[in-house]
Regions:
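Dinucleotide-binding Rossmann-like beta1-alpha1 core, especially the glycine-rich loop
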Residues: 49-127, 247, 254-259
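Beta1/beta-strand and adjacent pyrophosphate-binding region of the FAD-binding site
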Residues: 1-15, 32
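Active-site acidic short loop of glycosyltransferases
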Residues: 4-5, 189, 196-197
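Conserved phosphate-binding and hydrolysis motifs of nucleotide-dependent enzymes
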Residues: 11-16, 191, 202-204
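Glycine-rich FAD pyrophosphate-binding loop
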Residues: 24-45
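Flavin (FAD/FMN) cofactor-binding and adjacent substrate-gating region
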Residues: 73, 85, 94-170, 175-183, ...
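Residues forming the Rossmann-fold NAD(P)(H) cofactor-binding site
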Residues: 17, 155, 208
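Active-site substrate-recognition segment that forms the wall
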Residues: 21-25, 49-51, 73, 80-88, ...
């Protein structure tokens, strides 16, 4: 393992490996990523992989727009399938307040250049035949949205980062992070230490532990969610047998759930 680097990224999930890739793409090829186990072994392996273009912030919306475009470009660059499926994303509104929020967002989306369609209950039914529209006011739909496979995306990022000169060390546990007298960082691991200019924590569930190494108390805790996989519905099987398009990602913010085809 190298003993000096411009930047050390801690955490081998999709966020960490994406960070390493983009550093290398900007010319910071003297960067290294440290992962305590294997890539995607934290939260990434079971993430839903949704690509929500929806965001009320103009700047964050630009990042989302970039990401959806970039994932397709990454496939071409690395030759690795990231599981990108442009199936659209439909957000349901069962209250007028929620529908007003979506209509306000459409103004932001139009400014960013993100395509958004406003759907009536009947149009929702046309897109998603299994949806009960009885209590719905409407919805918005992002035709360019969809989902990716997070583990596949991470491996594509890793290949792209390595191709650009960056290094990845798996099965490497970070023990401490300290400031040196010459104002660099010393990252101590169970395989030795690395001196670097910058440390980027992308440690997910371990963010609080990593923060304490530099004297920060990060109010971050893991939250358990429910993940349900159902048997295949006859209508969905029929659609697949007929080679019809995959149904879009469906979201209900008021009921706090989302779903997509597996």
């Amino acid at each position: 393992m190298k003993s000096k680097a411009r930047a050390v990224v801690i955490g081998g999930g999709v966020v960490g490996v994406s960070t390493l890739y983009h550093l290398a793409a900007k010319g910071w090829d003297d960067s290294i990523l440290l992962e305590r186990k294997s890539l995607t072994s934290g939260s990434t392996w079971h993430a839903a992989g949704l690509l929500p273009l929806f965001n009320m912030s103009y700047s964050v919306g630009q990042i989302h727009k970039y990401s959806v475009r970039f994932y397709q470009e990454l496939q071409d660059e690395t030759g690795m399938d990231v599981g990108f499926r442009k199936v659209s994303n439909i957000r349901l509104a069962s209250t007028q307040d929620r529908m007003d929020e979506y209509l306000q967002y459409k103004g932001v989306a139009d400014t960013i250049g993100v395509e958004v369609n406003v759907l009536s209950p009947q149009e929702i039914k046309d897109c998603w035949p299994l949806v009960s529209t009885e209590n719905l006011i409407g919805a918005i739909q992002h035709p360019e949205d969809g989902y990716i496979q997070p583990a596949d995306l991470t491996q594509a990022f890793a290949k792209g980062a390595r191709d650009k000169g960056a290094k990845i060390e798996i099965n490497t546990n970070v023990i401490s992070i300290k400031r040196s007298p010459n104002d660099t960082w010393i990252v101590e691991t169970d395989k030795g230490h690395i001196e670097c200019e910058h440390v980027i924590s992308c440690s997910g569930n371990f963010a609080r532990k990593t923060g304490k190494m530099v004297g920060l108390d990060l109010p971050v805790i893991p939250v358990e969610h429910q993940y349900i996989v159902t048997e295949q519905h006859p209508l969905i099987k029929e659609r697949k047998d007929k080679n019809l398009p995959e149904l879009g990602v469906l979201r209900d913010s008021d009921a706090s759930w989302y779903m997509r085809e597996e």
